[in-house]
A protein has these predicted regions:
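Conserved donor-binding/catalytic core segment of Leloir-type glycosyltransferases
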Residues: 78-96, 102-105, 119
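Short alpha-helical segment that forms part of, or immediately flanks, the ligand-binding pocket
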Residues: 156, 175-183, 197-198
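Short hydrophobic beta-strand element within catalytic cores of glycosyltransferases
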Residues: 187-190
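A short, active-site helix/loop in glycosyltransferases that binds the activated sugar's phosphate group
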Residues: 21, 33-59, 64-68
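Conserved acidic donor-binding segment of nucleotide-sugar-dependent glycosyltransferases
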Residues: 202-203, 207-213
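Aromatic "clamp/platform" in nucleotide-sugar-dependent glycosyltransferases that forms part
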Residues: 170
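Short alpha-helical donor nucleotide-sugar binding micro-motif in glycosyltransferases
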Residues: 149, 157-162
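Short, structured helix-loop element that forms part of the nucleotide-activated donor/catalytic region
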Residues: 44, 119-142, 154
């Protein structure tokens, strides 16, 4: 309705590929000159381009406060046994790929498993993802842990204490928890199907793996 109007419009895109089959019929095929499209990253831009390839989209990445400079209560991670902690945060759904992370952990050599710990944080939106995590925590109770919810202070404390963030998403425009980890100077291992993959400098502040492949994730 605003296309071609006198009102300047900034249209900010942060949707995943998964949403476009449901909304594509509502997206105009041509935009007035008053409309400017921006996206949270290349993944979000590619998602729009999957249905409107002719749209000109510019990057506009969100900002977050410097949480690392704030004061927050301490979250007790002693259950991780003092080992390097690899954490992932987000709702349990196919798009978020918790099952991929679970499979990657199972592929690790026993000697590597003994030296590391893993934490899954999030609500169970899809039973299949929750089942994968529950099965893994049952098989590896000393190394793999699940927490349904953390407060904002607890999330900040987790970011301050963990070793690395892992995002195994199949379709994720710009996962906030990875950005929060980067604020705390923590490296991230992310899927190529995340907006964050376009920001990572390989081997410097993280690693990117391809093809939603648990073996490639395990190698990282």
């Amino acid at each position: 309705a605003l296309s071609g109007a006198r009102v300047p419009v900034l249209w900010w895109l942060h949707d995943a590929f998964a949403g476009y089959p449901h909304i594509a019929h509502q997206i105009p095929r041509k935009l007035g000159e008053n409309i400017r499209l921006y996206s949270v990253g290349s993944h979000a831009a590619n998602a729009m381009h999957s249905v409107r390839p002719e749209f000109n989209i510019r990057p506009l990445i969100y900002g977050l406060p410097d949480y690392a400079a704030e004061k927050f209560s301490h979250y007790d991670l002693s259950y991780a046994g003092g080992r390097p902690l690899f954490a992932t945060v987000g709702s349990f759904e196919n798009r978020k790929g918790q099952d991929i992370f679970c499979k990657a952990i199972r592929l690790l050599p026993p000697e590597t498993m003994k030296k590391a710990s893993f934490l899954f944080v999030g609500k169970a939106a899809e039973a299949e993802m929750m089942d994968a995590v529950r099965s893994l925590t049952a098989d590896c109770p000393d190394n793999v842990f699940y927490v349904k919810r953390l407060t904002r202070d607890e999330i900040k404390s987790l970011m301050a204490q963990c070793t690395c963030l892992v995002c195994a998403s199949r379709d994720d425009p710009m996962p906030t928890f990875v950005t929060e980890g980067l604020i705390f100077g923590k490296p991230a291992i992310v899927s190529e199907h995340t907006g964050t993959a376009g920001l990572i400098t390989e081997g410097v502040d993280g690693f990117v793996y391809e093809d939603d492949d648990p073996e490639k994730l395990a190698e990282r």
